């Protein structure tokens, strides 16, 4: 479920964009249509909200319909070419280029009521790296402000003979992430990173996401299947030309067919970690 970004390039291929769109729709459905789990009063006229790793700003655009037009919405991402054009943004939305590993503008420090981020921390190379990235995000909140983070865990899936394609997909994905210094399991590490960063009043939810035939309904079955297939296609591009250790083109072709069939007939599951808390006042 994590962000799949090739460390050699910050641009995104169309299948990766499709994956992010599907991911947003699926997670919104899993959350019962909610965009935030933190107990934030979205009716406040002076709200300042940051969405880090905003991509196409899907989350912010949905949020814009729920908050007053006087609220200030900011989105950041390493790939600004994916931002919606100004004509498709509300006047109270600002989008700008920013990596979570680069220093943040001093004017942004301590200025947000809510900092939100989904599926970005896989890019951290170690627990220390993750804790530091979370601490930098927390520093953007006002004293008493909220931080809400969402991450996945690619390591924990259903295994066994009936899940051979999903297991092979998992193994290829984990190897690809590790090869570019990313961690495949930021979800289980999330609360430790947040606690070490100084987050207080923390709450964590771990949800099981049914994939394909194991999904709660047909729409989520279709979204989750396409999400997995788009991840596989992104990993295929990441590993192209990377030597004998990378799967062959034929293996990717065969695996995509097998993975689709297995998900549609048997299904699988992922664990989804959501945690929120506050900056100490």
Curated annotation (Swiss-Prot):
The SS bond pairs are none
Q: In which pathway does it act?
A: Secondary metabolite biosynthesis
Sections of the chain in a coiled coil: none
List the molecular function annotations (GO) for this entry.
methyltransferase activity
Print the keywords alphabetically. Answer: Methyltransferase, S-adenosyl-L-methionine, Transferase
Q: Indicate the enzyme's highest-level EC class.
A: transferase
- Do you know what upregulates this one? Expression is positively regulated by the thioclapurine cluster-specific transcription factor tcpZ.
Q: Which domain of life is it from?
A: Eukaryota
Q: What is its EC number?
A: 2.1.1.-
The alphabetized list of GO BP terms reads:
methylation
Q: Quote the Pfam families the UniProt record gives.
A: Methyltransf_23 (PF13489)
The task this protein performs is described as: N-methyltransferase; part of the gene cluster that mediates the biosynthesis of an unusual class of epipolythiodioxopiperazines (ETPs) lacking the reactive thiol group important for toxicity. Firstly, L-tyrosine is prenylated by tcpD, before undergoing condensation with L-glycine in a reaction catalyzed by the NRPS tcpP leading to the diketopiperazine (DKP) backbone. Afterwards the alpha-carbon of tyrosine is oxidized by the cytochrome P450 tcpC to form a hydroxyl group.
- So what family is this one in? Belongs to the methyltransferase superfamily. LaeA methyltransferase family.
Question: What is this protein identified as?
Answer: N-methyltransferase tcpN
Q: What organism is the protein native to?
A: Claviceps purpurea (strain 20.1)
Task: State the organism's lineage.
Answer: Eukaryota, Fungi, Dikarya, Ascomycota, Pezizomycotina
């Amino acid at each position: 479920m994590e962000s799949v970004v090739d460390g050699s390039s910050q641009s995104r291929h169309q299948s990766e964009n499709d994956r992010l769109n599907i991911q947003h729709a699926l997670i919104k459905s899993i959350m019962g249509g909610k965009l935030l789990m933190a107990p934030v009063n979205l009716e406040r006229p002076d709200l300042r909200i940051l969405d880090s790793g905003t991509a196409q700003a899907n989350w912010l655009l949905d949020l814009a319909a729920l908050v007053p037009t006087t609220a200030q919405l900011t989105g950041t991402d390493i790939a600004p070419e994916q931002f919606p054009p100004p004509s498709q943004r509300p006047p109270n939305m600002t989008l700008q280029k920013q990596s979570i590993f680069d220093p943040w503008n001093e004017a942004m420090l301590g200025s947000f009521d809510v900092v939100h981020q989904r599926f970005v921390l896989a890019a951290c190379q170690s627990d220390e790296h993750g804790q530091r990235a979370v601490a930098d995000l927390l520093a953007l909140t006002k004293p008493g402000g909220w931080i809400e983070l969402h991450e996945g865990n690619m390591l924990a899936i259903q295994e066994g003979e009936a899940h051979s394609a999903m297991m092979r997909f998992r193994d290829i994905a984990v190897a690809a992430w590790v090869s570019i210094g990313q961690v495949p399991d930021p979800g289980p590490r999330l609360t430790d990173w947040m606690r070490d960063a100084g987050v207080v009043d923390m709450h964590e939810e771990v949800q099981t996401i049914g994939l394909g035939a194991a999904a709660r309904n047909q729409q989520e079955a279709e979204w989750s299947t396409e999400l997995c297939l788009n991840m596989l296609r992104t990993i295929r591009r990441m590993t192209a030309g990377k030597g004998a250790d990378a799967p062959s083109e034929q293996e990717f072709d065969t695996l995509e067919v097998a993975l689709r069939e297995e998900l549609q007939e048997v299904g699988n599951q992922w664990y989804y970690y959501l945690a929120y808390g506050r900056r100490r006042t």
